[in-house]
Regions:
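Short acidic, hydrophobic short linear motifs in intrinsically disordered regions
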Residues: 19-30
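A short, conserved structural fragment
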Residues: 50-60
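Short amphipathic alpha-helical interaction segments
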Residues: 36-51
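Minor-groove-contacting beta-hairpin "wing" of winged helix-turn-helix DNA-binding domains
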Residues: 62-68
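Short alpha-helical segments that sit at the start of domains
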Residues: 1-20, 36
Length: 92
């Protein structure tokens, strides 16, 4: 399920106008896609994506803002593959 959550996060970030979302918004969106997780699990997902260079995370108080990188956009759009991230389907 982590692979699905990771690609979902990347696709969400790729589709918003400023390519960034706060942790709470990401949690809500994952829930809408039946991929809900605990806040600790979400922090781990975001940290893993940041370690892979797919997003950057900026701490804001007790939360953080995630922003997709160019590499993350390539993965979200199926132009690059990263082990641990589900390959996106051809249909969006």
């Amino acid at each position: 399920m982590r692979e699905h959550q990771r690609i979902c996060i990347l696709r969400m970030l790729d589709q918003v106008p400023d390519y960034s979302m706060n942790e709470s918004m990401i949690a809500d969106e994952l829930g809408r896609w039946a991929l809900a997780c605990s806040r600790d699990q979400l922090k781990s997902l975001l940290a893993w994506l940041a370690e892979q260079g797919l997003i950057t995370c900026e701490p804001i108080g007790h939360s953080q803002i995630a922003r997709i990188t160019q590499r993350g956009q390539d993965v979200a759009n199926g132009l690059a593959l990263v082990p641990g991230v589900k390959r996106p389907s051809a249909v969006r």
